[in-house]
UniProtKB/Swiss-Prot annotation:
The gene coding this protein: tig
Catalytic activity as recorded in UniProt: [protein]-peptidylproline (omega=180) = [protein]-peptidylproline (omega=0)
GO cellular component entries: cytoplasm
Organism from which the protein derives: Synechococcus sp. (strain WH7803)
The protein's name in its UniProt record: Trigger factor
Biased composition (Basic residues): 462-471
Record remark: domains: Consists of 3 domains; the N-terminus binds the ribosome, the middle domain has PPIase activity, while the C-terminus has intrinsic chaperone activity on its own.
Function according to Swiss-Prot or TrEMBL: Involved in protein export. Acts as a chaperone by maintaining the newly synthesized protein in an open conformation. Functions as a peptidyl-prolyl cis-trans isomerase.
Gene Ontology process terms (BP): 'de novo' cotranslational protein folding; cell division; chaperone-mediated protein folding; protein transport; protein unfolding
Enzyme Commission no: 5.2.1.8
Amino acid sequence: MSAASLKVTTTSRPGSRLAVEVAVPAERSQASYEEAITRLSRSVNLPGFRKGKVPRTVLVQQLGALRIRATALESLVESVWRDALAQETIEALGQPELSGSFEELLDTFKPGEALTVTMETDVAPSPTLKSTKGLKAEAETVAFDAAKVDEMLEQSRRQLATVVPVEGRKAEQGDIAVVGFKGTYSDDGSEIEGGSADSMDVDLEHGRMIPGFVEGVVGMAVGDSKTVDCTFPEDYPKEDARGRKASFAIELKDLKTRELPELDDAFAKQASEQETLAELRSDLEQRLKDDAERRSRSNRHDALLAALVEQLEVELPESLIQQEVRNLVEQTAGQFAQQGMDVQSLFTPELVRNLMESSRPEAEERLRRSLALTALAESEKLSVDDADLNAKLKEVKGQLSGERDIDPERLRQAVLDDLLQEKLLGWLEENSTVTEKAPEAESDAAKASKPAAAKKDASKAKTAKTSKAKTAKAESESAES
């Protein structure tokens, strides 16, 4: 029976869903039943009969009429759904769902009689924008901070420092203490899991250990022992330790410090590809200025995209949301794996459920941003020229010449997505108004993270400008705004 003979009626449902009602003619329901009997006859093993030679009456008696009808109906539903999609050119997302139960449909199914099958499926959303031009947004401008040049130089000096033993004085801030310690909870005296070590190097810097630990070691002499009272922060990774008071019995076994290299041309050559300290300073300054501009541009784009999303009208299908949630969870798992963590043991079913639940708002926001840009491209007829795409592809492939396991089609799509997004965001900047807003007050957590961030920036001093090829490889699945 050809798909053209089916009568198909579609009805839109909320949440970007579509109800598809298919009128199945009597001859097709009969054909499905006959095919089911033939299939079962070929697969069933009955004593005294060869496969495919079981008489119909015996087959029905042995298997039961209900099982044969159910087998026929399953096949019929699958085939009419496939034909209806092709006939109506419906782009379904995921698997369809019967309107009602299979058992209810089975009760109405009589081979040789017409049947109506109604199914629902998610379909691709149809995003529209109420407005595209004249949008208004506020964005923070990131200013170049000259003091960060000195911070980066200091961090680089620390990385290139020579560690030497300390003699004749007590531990000071910035030293490296070799300590043995044993931690117990103050409330019940139980040992802290992972809270003991026979010998461990500890940088005596604020934020390296839980509050109170480093401060307790400062002032100790080699060979000293003392008990230090600490309190685990409320955001400590181990939930059962959060906010609990603890005592650490500490022994200072050895003490070392760093001898920093002189800040001169020799240091510049060792720390970077520059020949002089002046050149290194100039290079770091330019990097910081470029970074400030990139961050400012990113802030403008984020603000404009948020303004565009406010103009978006769309219903997100649940299947798309769930797929994006899974993508986010997989990204999290990948990040943990790169850090050497055992993802299989860490990602328990409960943790995965919690991650999926907490990731849903971000997943929905990412979908809205993506669909808003899609709608903008369609509304303003913006696209990427083949010449621009091919030129960028040639550039990226040249940078990836030594890389393996790169899917050419995925790479092409990633480059196309990046170029289109760049074009769309540029168009938004030209056709919208972005005003500068005052920087938000810096939180204590952000302040505490500054040394680590400065260290990360300083580590780049010895490396040439980050390769765009690596970015293209890392983003080979999709362009992220």
